[in-house]
Amino acid sequence: MFRENFSNSKVHLIGPLQSNKVKQAVELFDAIHTIDRLKLAQKLSKEIQSQGKAPEMFIQINTGEEKQKSGIIPSEADQFISDCFSLDLPIKGLMVIPPINEEPSLHFGLLKKIAHRNGLTGLSMGMSSDFESAIAMGATHIRVGSAIFGERDYS
């Protein structure tokens, strides 16, 4: 229904992707911003070949090396990016969500360096609270749901 009403819109997956939902994700989304493990990359590669449809892909980098967050740690990023290219994944860029109590621009800068040395132009970084800094650092995609729709109600 969304596609029928908004046929010119691009739909991006910005949340975690479970391996068992890969088929639906490739069918539904124009971009996937959370490639965070080799098993997922391998399944996406097979599904893209099967469907003949290739959403843009962003690899999630855990620049803060936070245990509670998904993503590839910076020291393993170059190898993971290479692995994804060898799977013929259409990697557009990298994505980061900085640690909440740290200066986001440091993490945006690190993401930009990793992207640059791997020939990637897409930078998915910045949320409602820090998107200005992300844009200043070269973000190509930002997530501003709270700024548009208001804060979430967790009650």
PLM region descriptions:
Residues 2-6, 132-155:
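C-terminal helical cap(s) of enzyme catalytic domains, especially alpha/beta-barrels
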